[in-house]
Amino acid sequence: MDADDFGKKDLENGNESPKKPIFMKDWKNSQPNEQGRWLHLDARMNRNIEDLEISNYNLRLMNEQLESQLLSLNVKPVVSFAEQGKSSESKTDEEGFILNSASNVLDNFISIVNELVQHAEDVLDDLG
């Protein structure tokens, strides 16, 4: 019995609105009243996607703020034209130093967060 036979059988029995089973390949194209539980699944998936998009947006904002703070900390005074002709090795060394500094800051931040989590767990253990 395919979907068309199912609808014909309902019409033969006197039902006014033929109901067809919904197959996964075309459930998004069905009418809302025919989708039944698939509407709920679609709504949950949309909500998950929206949550991920919001998280992504917030993380991008945080990243931009951290980058701007890093740039503001590393602002250097104007140098003469002769000093601008540095070798590529010294520029690479400076970039490595900046990356290493940023890595150290992130490591310190992670260790602080880990300590806070550990302290919170200790407090919860004491209360429980």
UniProtKB/Swiss-Prot annotation:
Keyword field contains Nucleus? yes
Cellular compartment(s): Cytoplasm; Nucleus
User: Which keywords label this protein?
Assistant: Cytoplasm, Nucleus
Q: Which GO cellular component does the record give, naming just one? A: cytoplasm
Q: Where is the composition biased (Basic and acidic residues)?
A: 1-28
Which parts of this chain are annotated as the region Disordered? 1-30
Q: What is its main location?
A: cytoplasm
**Name this polypeptide is given:** Uncharacterized protein C24B10.03
Species assigned in the record: Schizosaccharomyces pombe (strain 972 / ATCC 24843) (Fission yeast)
